[in-house]
Amino acid sequence: MLLSYNADLLPRVRMLGRINYTEPWIHFSRTIDEYVLYVIRDGNMYLQEDGIFYHLKAGDFFLLEPGLCHEGYQRAACNYYYAHFTHPEMARMKDEDAAMALLAEKRRLSLVSYNLDEADPTDSITYLPKQFHLPGSEFNTILRTALDCYNAREEHYKRRTAALLHSFFLEVAHEHLLARGAAQGKKLKKSEVVAERLLHYLNENYTRPL
């Protein structure tokens, strides 16, 4: 399941934190009007949302959606980050394959783009997975930085926290695209990137003497 996400717009963060339940715990039932992000550091979380059951493990990224009832269905110890936020242009996608094909094309266009051009090589829409296993532990660094910023409550702390969360989302979208491409055996060869960049350069500079 994918959610479209306009990368030109920051999320509005209401709350961000980290909880460590060392004793088995079960999530309470609720329906809220905002997105909730969970990133599991250690342990397990058992959730059902809108009748679908999920088992989250260490390293998992998960997004709860507004307006859908969610609750736990099994007790477990769990250490996790959470963020409650809204976003003006974020919605569930119907055609996931088409969305990922579009994102793969955006990656190709970005790789062959000239980075001094004023215009961005693609539009601002990316796609976030609802559930994804993060490939490394680096996510801890950016989430810990965001949490420190949020807890410090210095000037513009929510905007700075939102910017960090936004960066994290873009990284997750990128890693999900790479993981999906690897699973499907698709990879843009370096030679193709070089050829595309050379073609772009020639098109831009064909009137100049070489």
Residue ranges, per PLM feature:
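Short, Lys/Arg-enriched, Trp-marked, Pro/Gly-tolerant hinge/linker segments that flank
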Residues: 124-137, 150-208
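Generic protein-terminus/edge-of-domain signal
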Residues: 1-77, 91, 95-131
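Short beta-strand segments
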Residues: 62-64, 82-86, 169
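Short, Lys/Arg-enriched alpha-helical recognition elements, typified by the DNA-recognition helix
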Residues: 140-147
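Short regulatory "switch" loops immediately downstream of catalytic or recognition motifs
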Residues: 86-94, 175-180
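Residue-level marker of positions within ordered structural domains that often coincide
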Residues: 21, 42, 88, 151, ...
